[in-house]
A protein has these predicted regions:
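Core mature regions of organelle-targeted
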Residues: 80-90
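Intrinsic-disorder/low-complexity loop/linker signature
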Residues: 87, 98-99, 166, 330
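Flavin (FAD/FMN) cofactor-binding and adjacent substrate-gating region
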Residues: 90-122, 267-281
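Flavin (primarily FAD) cofactor-binding/catalytic cores of flavoenzymes
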Residues: 2-77, 82, 125-246, 252-484
Length: 484
């Protein structure tokens, strides 16, 4: 799991018993209230959640607490490797404060602190600065197991299309299809668009000469060699430190900015309630706030920077954008305003672009999805192409239509991934915001399911005639005699 000592299985079992009692006390689970749907193509799930990382798991738990149990979570990765933590994330620890409680829904026994303390002891928690990446993944594995969440692994979604009667058809890479009334895209930081690879790189380098930080990288093949990293955000330093720790000879980080990023606006958001109250802002206020947010590169954590900078093979080049790249004699040649460099391999820490038109699973629906650029008018000097490409979401993370005629196509489709940033702030894919975002999403899904069936439910309610009171008056003689 990590360099922490072995798990205290007795304490963990006691915690799980406490959790079971807490769940029972707050009546977390119960029979479904939703009305079953039938479809000629097969079983109809009330909700299919695409993505089995922290967002998908927590969404599933929230729905079960609302007594919506006809659900299924899908993840393209093998069991235990959902999300980025054991696939491409290379930071040593999470970047968020250890005391956050993002996915526990207020249940003390489900918090990361309760689990960590049960596993490793209170002293280990007190000594902890931030939660190690691998330990966080172990918490998520436990979360899935202890809550018995319905997750199907090795299931990659390739398409989402309307199947009629308020149902979506969810196509999988293996040829199977599923049906669902609601589909939640809990697809992480990249799930609302794609990782950005600059055209200069795509057009001038062979594919084997570079990788994005979001991709697997064979660092063993780079032992003793020279690697260049384009970009100066947190992931650049995560990858630099990780590569050097794996035996890479030199790592050079190149930043366009002339100074290291020092301000992390997320910390301000956490302090003043920005994460919880952001959705109440007007569109223009959101636009300006997120323009400021996107102007910052998230800085590395201090410990990650210090680790990376302590390696003899580490170099940092400020004010050094890549003006040209070329592939010559098996090496990547990088030209900056100041010098020329030769590398055996380069890594791109160039961020991502959120745009539903880039998602292959949304190919049939993306033309009908409203974007911020379609909906919000800003003065010409304030327009931001990155913001304009984000989907314009409703208050419960639901996609909204570009035209009123498109409403039925999108009704029931939710974007609980990083593309929600502009509409709803730090929420999905951001541990700092999930505590507030999850109830909003779950309530919105439950409301839709209820309102979709309101005519039938109201008719049943009006016709309801099940008698509960069984007393009689005048009282029968037998009852009077028994009372005497």
């Amino acid at each position: 799991m990590s360099d922490l000592h072995a798990v205290d299985t007795v304490a963990l079992a006691a915690l799980e018993a406490d959790l079971a009692q807490q769940l029972a006390l707050v009546d977390s689970f119960g029979p479904d209230w939703t009305r079953p749907r039938t479809h000629p193509e097969g079983h109809v799930h009330d909700v299919v959640i695409v993505g089995g990382g922290q967002s998908g798991l927590a969404t599933a738990f929230g729905l079960k607490r609302e007594r919506i149990n006809n659900i299924l979570v899908l993840d393209e990765n093998p069991e235990g490797f959902e999300g980025p933590w054991e696939t491409y994330a290379r930071m040593i620890t999470l970047r968020t404060p250890k005391g956050l409680t993002p996915i526990d829904y207020g249940l003390p026994a489900l918090t990361p602190q309760a689990w960590f303390t049960a596993c490793f002891g209170a002293a280990a928690w007190d000594a902890l600065d931030k939660i190690p990446r691998g330990v966080w993944m172990e918490y998520l594995r436990w979360y899935r197991r202890v809550l018995n969440l319905p997750l199907r692994n090795d299931a990659r979604v390739t398409g989402i299309t309307p199947a009629g009667d308020g149902v979506y058809r969810v196509a999988l890479a293996d040829g199977a299809t599923l049906l669902a009334r609601k589909v939640v895209l809990a697809t992480g930081i990249q799930g609302g668009g794609e990782w950005h690879t600059p055209a200069m790189i795509r057009e001038n380098l062979p594919r084997h000469a570079y990788a994005h930080t979001s991709e697997p990288i064979d660092l063993a093949a780079l032992e003793g060699k020279r690697v260049g990293i384009l970009g100066g955000g947190a992931s650049a330093f995560d990858n630099a430190n990780h590569a050097l720790a794996q035996g890479v000879g030199e790592v050079h980080v190149f930043m366009r900015r002339k100074a290291l990023p020092r301000i992390n606006p997320i910390r301000f958001m956490e302090r003043v309630g920005f994460t919880a109250r952001y959705p109440a802002l007007s569109d223009a206020e959101k636009y300006r706030a997120m323009a400021a947010f996107l102007s910052h590169n998230q800085p590395p954590t201090n410990d990650t920077f210090n680790r990376a900078a302590s390696w003899p093979g580490f170099a940092l080049h400020l004010g050094s954008p890549w003006n040209e790249v070329a592939h010559e004699d098996g090496q990547v040649i990088v030209t900056t305003p100041h010098d020329r460099f030769a590398f055996d391999f380069v890594i791109l820490s160039t961020g991502l672009i959120s745009d539903p038109r880039l998602r292959p699973e949304l190919a049939a629906l993306a033309p009908h999805i409203a974007l911020w650029g379609d909906v919000v008018a800003m003065p010409e000097g304030e327009r931001n192409a990155l913001i304009d490409a984000h989907p314009y979401l409703g208050p419960a993370f639901e996609f909204t239509p570009r035209a009123p005629a498109d409403a039925a196509l999108l009704h029931g489709l939710f974007a609980f991934n990083y593309s929600a940033l502009i509409s709803l702030g730090l929420s999905a894919s951001a541990l700092s915001g999930m505590k507030n975002a999850l109830p909003r999403l779950v309530r919105g899904i439950a409301d839709q399911l209820f309102l979709d069936d309101r005519e039938a439910l109201l008719a049943q309610f009006i016709a309801y005639d099940e008698e509960e009171f069984v007393g009689e008056w005048p009282r029968p003689a037998s009852a009077v005699e028994a009372a005497a």
